[in-house]
């Protein structure tokens, strides 16, 4: 099917240090369609870069693929790689977006983080990206972000 995929169907070595090289993609079987794909990671963890305390959140990734789609096991391993990574919530979300845009070159992509509150404040960063033809869609999504 797609022999170049390394993670799917293989024994899983879990890496808990940020590593964008874990992400893999496969050819979009229907590049003429524009599905809005939602991926949800309910167990995202990273470390506060100041206190080294763990942060927990749900990461929502939505995208309209162009020629490539993200392989879900590689995405899981990539998101797990944040486990011992010290970074602010906003930085995690921005980096996830940039890594996925570099890998997929999608028509549209957004990342939203719903982080558990610490000190009584919940941080919920949102960032999105679009190619020229999807800029209007991007603006509408930004205005309607949670």
From Swiss-Prot:
This entry's Enzyme Commission designation comes to 1.7.1.13
Pathway the protein takes part in: tRNA modification; tRNA-queuosine biosynthesis
Q: Which reaction does it catalyse?
A: 7-aminomethyl-7-carbaguanine + 2 NADP(+) = 7-cyano-7-deazaguanine + 2 NADPH + 3 H(+)
Any idea which UniProt keywords this protein has? Cytoplasm, NADP, Oxidoreductase, Queuosine biosynthesis
Just give the chief location class. Answer: cytoplasm
Q: Active site: which residues? A: 48 (thioimide intermediate), 55 (proton donor)
Q: Biological process GO terms, please?
A: queuosine biosynthetic process; tRNA modification
**Where found, per UniProt?**
Cytoplasm
Molecular function GO labels: preQ1 synthase activity
Q: Which Pfam families match?
A: QueF
Q: Which residues does the record give as substrate binding sites? A: 70-72, 89-90
EC main class here is: oxidoreductase
Q: What Gene Ontology terms describe where this protein resides (cellular component)?
A: cytoplasm
Q: Which family does it belong to?
A: Belongs to the GTP cyclohydrolase I family. QueF type 1 subfamily.
Functional note: Catalyzes the NADPH-dependent reduction of 7-cyano-7-deazaguanine (preQ0) to 7-aminomethyl-7-deazaguanine (preQ1).
Would you tell me the protein name for this molecule?
NADPH-dependent 7-cyano-7-deazaguanine reductase
The source organism is: Helicobacter pylori (strain Shi470)
